[in-house]
Curated annotation (Swiss-Prot):
GO molecular function, one term: ribonuclease M5 activity
Keyword RNA-binding: yes
Keyword Cell membrane: no
Pfam short name (any one): Toprim
Protein name per its UniProtKB record: Ribonuclease M5
GO cellular component labels: cytoplasm
Protein EC: 3.1.26.8
Similarity comment: family membership: Belongs to the ribonuclease M5 family.
Compartment(s) of residence: Cytoplasm
Catalytic reactions on record: Endonucleolytic cleavage of RNA, removing 21 and 42 nucleotides, respectively, from the 5'- and 3'-termini of a 5S-rRNA precursor
Organism of origin: Clostridium acetobutylicum (strain ATCC 824 / DSM 792 / JCM 1419 / IAM 19013 / LMG 5710 / NBRC 13948 / NRRL B-527 / VKM B-1787 / 2291 / W)
Cofactor info, note text: Binds two Mg(2+) per subunit.
Residue sites binding Mg(2+) 1 per the record: 9, 55
InterPro entries given in the database record: RNase_M5, RNase_M5_C, TOPRIM_dom, TOPRIM_RNase_M5-like
Amino acid sequence: MIKEVIVVEGRDDITAVKRAVDAEMIAVGGFGINSKIISKIKEAQKRRGVIVLTDPDFAGEKIRSIISKRVKGIKHARISQSEGTKNGDIGVENASPESIIRALNNAKCETQKKTYEFTIEDMLFFKLVGNSEAKKRRDLVGNELGIGYSNGAQFLSRLNNFGISKEELINAVNTVNRRYYDEGI
C-alpha cells in the first residue's frame, strides 16, 4: 500500500495504477481541474502526502504545473513517453504495472529553495545538450532519475529544482552509458 494519495488525470489512469499498486487516488478530469479538486488535493497533501502521476505529454505537464503551483510539497512521479505510448496514444493508462511502480518509487519532491548545483557546462559535459544524441540522452537519464523528459533548459531546471546531487546524476549517466552506449564516465 502506497502511503500517499496518487493524483492522476482520469478514470483509465486509475485502472492502470490499481493494476500496479494499492493506493488511494484522485482523478482531476484532465483540464477540468477546478478549485474543488485543488481543495481535495490540498487536504490529501496535509493528511498523507500526494504524488502526481500525469501523462508524459504537454497536457500532462500543464496539469502537473497547475497542481504544483497551488499545492506545495507534492511529489512528482513520471513515466517516459515510450512507457506510456500504445498504438500512438500517450497516457499513464498505457503504461505497464512495472513502469508505474518504478515511477512511484522514483517520485521526487520539488525543493522549496532552488539550488544551483548544475550549470549548462554540466549539461554539455554529460552530453545532455549540444550533441546529436542529447534529446535521447535527456529522455534516458531523466527516466533513470525520475524527473522525466524535457528540453535542455527545463532539464537543467529540474535537476536543480528536485535536489538531484552530482553523484545521482553521474550514477544515472553511467547507467545509461553502460546500458545503451557501452561506455562509462
